[in-house]
Amino acid sequence: MVREARANRSSFLKVKCPDCDNEQTVFSKASTTVKCVVCGRDLATPTGGKANLKAEIISEFK
């Protein structure tokens, strides 16, 4: 029972870049800086746990 509750703490997120409106998939607990592939803006920065997102979340994949 504990394993089921702890299994889904992270997910993939589809985010939208605020500068160029490019949609990109990022991991919710990214350990490196994620940049937009089109314009190069930082979309997510690592914090030691969940990433600090600087983009709009469109959808979540669990």
Swiss-Prot record:
GO terms of molecular function: structural constituent of ribosome; zinc ion binding
Q: Does the keyword Transferase apply?
A: no
Asked if Nucleotidyltransferase is a keyword of the record, the answer is no
- Requisite cofactors: Zn(2+)
- Tell me the keywords, alphabetical order: Metal-binding, Ribonucleoprotein, Ribosomal protein, Zinc, Zinc-finger
- GO BP annotations, alphabetical order: translation
Show the GO cellular component annotation of the record: ribonucleoprotein complex; ribosome
- Gene3D superfamilies with a match to the protein in the record: Zn-binding ribosomal proteins
Q: Which amino acids does the record list as binding Zn(2+)?
A: 17, 20, 36, 39
Under PROSITE patterns, the record lists: RIBOSOMAL_S27E
Q: Which InterPro entries match?
A: Ribosomal_eS27, Ribosomal_eS27_Zn-bd_dom_sf, Ribosomal_zn-bd
Segments forming C4-type zinc fingers: 17-39
* HAMAP family in UniProt: Ribosomal_eS27 (MF_00371)
Q: How does it assemble?
A: Part of the 30S ribosomal subunit.
Family membership = Belongs to the eukaryotic ribosomal protein eS27 family.
Name of the protein in question = Small ribosomal subunit protein eS27
Taxonomic source organism:
Methanoregula boonei (strain DSM 21154 / JCM 14090 / 6A8)
